[in-house]
């Protein structure tokens, strides 16, 4: 132990309106950040002086200072540099405009701004949402965060959309507190896998969150910040237009793509403000395998936690104790459809799934619906389980669950997403 060398220390002096960016790709590397003097923030969350913050593999970090500061890095990031060109001041100005609208809403007892962030993949949409949310709660607001990105599933897990009342800034190295989120099961990681069902869920989530805004004065004045996925052409663009109407959006921030900005100016009602913002130079493009790894990590965190470990439960569930469904059945030619049924109905149909080996490693959503007489596809979910073993002989599924037995409800919805539990 005595021969173990102390981690490399590097000190960075940042000038006003600059940021320190670093990335960690090495699985065995940990980098610790400490603010030595001055003021700095990470995506809108303030760093506490002399408190060490630890980051691991996959971290892509940008620590910004408005007034100048000194930061110490311990460890060896793959990339680390200071950038003086950053859009943070523009992001802050945009936030000031939103805060002005919130103050006016409070004064007039009307609804605060409902804001949507759009743009192609890898332009920093989730980061900008986080910045806006953190700034809002630092000013005493309580905005609702809505995530329509089924690819990464920032509020629950991939294959879902959801909403969350944000009451405190996100911890520096983690996401927002996940207490009592409203989550809907989609079951795929791309909206194009079931276009019709995705549209139905957007409408349902919009209806529910707008009701919640009305019921909570503080949230009503604070408004919403809506994150979207990076599919911005064709069907993806139609979903953006649908979401703008469904959520009664009054401001859209377009990151990086002028074509999308101009299309929205052309197609959206004039009452909706369309604002173009540049992406940060620190945004990193992710490969397909990096996206898949990020999805896996998200599910692993759901069951096992991140900084604070969680201890999930493993137990058996009898086939006869649960009802398993998937949403959507293969499309039939029009001539084969039952009388009065439309082709679209196939995509939102509840299809019974027989328990069997095909469910191994699949994520199942536990629906709040109590029976199939309820509108199951539009019911929110209590949480998720993973099938770790199937015994046809005993007719039981072995599942990984965040809670001990029994399951809170018996209707389970199959996700395309698979998670290989390596614990």
Curated annotation (Swiss-Prot):
Record: residues binding ATP: 19, 60, 122-127
Pfam families listed in its UniProt record: Clp1, CLP1_N, CLP1_P
Keyword Ion transport: no
Record's keyword terms, sorted: ATP-binding, mRNA processing, Nucleotide-binding, Nucleus
InterPro entries cross-referenced by the UniProt entry: Clp1, Clp1/Grc3, Clp1_C, Clp1_C_sf, Clp1_N, Clp1_N_sf, CLP1_P, P-loop_NTPase
GO cellular component: mRNA cleavage factor complex
Subcellular location(s) per record: Nucleus
Function in brief: Required for endonucleolytic cleavage during polyadenylation-dependent pre-mRNA 3'-end formation.
UniProt-recorded name of the protein: Protein CLP1 homolog
Organism annotation: Culex quinquefasciatus
């Amino acid at each position: 132990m005595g021969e173990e060398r102390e981690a490399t220390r590097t000190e960075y002096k940042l000038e006003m309106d600059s940021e320190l960016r670093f990335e960690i790709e090495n699985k065995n590397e940990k980098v610790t950040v400490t603010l030595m003097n001055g003021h700095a923030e990470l995506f809108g969350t303030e760093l506490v002086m002399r408190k060490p913050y630890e980051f691991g593999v996959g971290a892509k970090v940008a620590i910004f200072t408005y007034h100048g500061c000194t930061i110490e890095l311990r460890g060896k990031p793959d990339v680390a540099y200071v950038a003086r060109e950053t859009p943070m001041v523009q992001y802050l100005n945009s936030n000031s405009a939103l805060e002005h609208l919130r103050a006016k809403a409070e004064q007039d007892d009307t609804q605060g701004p409902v804001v949507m962030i759009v743009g192609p993949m890898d332009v920093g949409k989730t980061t900008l949402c986080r910045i806006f949310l953190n700034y809002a709660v630092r000013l005493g607001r309580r905005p609702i965060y809505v995530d329509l990105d089924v690819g990464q599933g920032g509020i629950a897990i991939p294959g879902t959309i959801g909403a969350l009342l944000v009451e405190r800034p996100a911890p520096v190295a983690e996401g927002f507190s996940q207490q009592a989120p409203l989550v809907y099961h989609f079951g795929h990681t791309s909206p194009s896998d079931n276009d019709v069902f995705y549209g139905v869920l957007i409408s349902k989530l919009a209806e529910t969150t707008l009701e919640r805004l009305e019921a909570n004065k503080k949230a009503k004045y604070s408004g919403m910040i809506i994150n979207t996925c990076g599919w911005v052409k064709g069907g993806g663009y139609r979903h953006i237009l649908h979401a703008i109407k469904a959520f009664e959006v009054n401001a859209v921030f377009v990151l990086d793509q002028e074509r999308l900005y101009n299309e929205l100016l052309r197609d959206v009602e004039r009452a909706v403000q369309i604002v173009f913002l540049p992406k940060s130079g620190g945004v990193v493009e992710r490969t397909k395998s990096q996206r898949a790894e990020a999805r896996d990590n998200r599910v692993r965190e759901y069951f096992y936690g991140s900084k604070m470990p969680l201890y999930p439960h493993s137990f058996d569930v009898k086939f006869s104790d649960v009802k398993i469904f998937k949403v959507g059945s293969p499309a039939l030619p029009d001539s084969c459809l039952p009388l009065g049924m439309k082709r679209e109905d196939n995509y939102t149909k509840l299809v019974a799934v027989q328990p069997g080996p095909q469910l191994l490693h699949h994520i199942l959503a536990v629906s709040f619906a109590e029976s199939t007489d309820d509108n199951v596809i539009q019911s929110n979910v209590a949480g998720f389980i993973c099938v770790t073993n199937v015994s046809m002989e005993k007719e039981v599924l072995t599942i990984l669950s965040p809670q001990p037995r029994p399951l809170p409800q018996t209707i389970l919805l199959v996700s395309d997403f698979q998670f290989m539990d390596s614990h």
